[in-house]
Amino acid sequence: MKRNRLARRPLLLLLSLLMLLGIFSTASAEESTNLLQNPGFEEIGADGLPVGWKTDAYLNLEGMTFYTVSDNAMSGAHSVQIENLDHNDARFCQTVAVEPSSFYRLSGYVKAWDTLDEGLGGNLSIKDVYVFSESVYDSPDEWQYVELYGVTDTDQHEVTVYARLGGYSGESFGTAMFDDLSLVKVDAPPEGIVASRWYQPTAAVQDDTSDDLADTAAASPAWPWMTAVGIAYVALGV
């Protein structure tokens, strides 16, 4: 009886590892799905602007802000450009369907110049909440990669992302360019990264499941490997 059980251990371990590989493969495929439409701005509409994107600004004054498509691209043929001739908060924006109580990563490449380190410069951000990626101020010859991790609310089903020059109480002038943007669902932020709330907190925020989810991910970034160890131990009968 003992011999049979020992003989089964390698098979059980192999099956456990195959199951684990399946779990990680599914997670990897999920994380690779870009939820943005026309994220590289390659498809241009009749109005001369990228399909799937809208423009918006804090100050919509004639001659203050210009939105254009450029052939100076990180990849492909096009990128987008925002030029503020005076201090403004201007952006390309897109609303995307998301899942409640879930983690996401917004990322992309940014160039900026003539901003003089004022305001929030070129950045990626989320509508209606004060969260921003790293700001880019003076990078006319080099694309800089920026990213932002967030968590959705328990009943949240959409989010509006901004490719932005300026920000709330951080208006900027100058020029910023954006290319190869990405919004993907992730299992959790990387170790040491805290996901920001991509929603307006309520008075009952202490009991919010999304906040508990963010705290758990920040405290336990290595949960997949702990799961792997547990499966292996069970398979070996330890």
List PLM regions with ranges:
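Extracellular glycan-recognition surfaces and repeat-rich motifs
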Residues: 42-79
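Sec-dependent signal peptide cleavage junction
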Residues: 21-32, 214-222
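Beta-strand acidic-aromatic groove motif in beta-rich domains, primarily in extracellular
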Residues: 50-53, 90-92, 114-128, 159-161
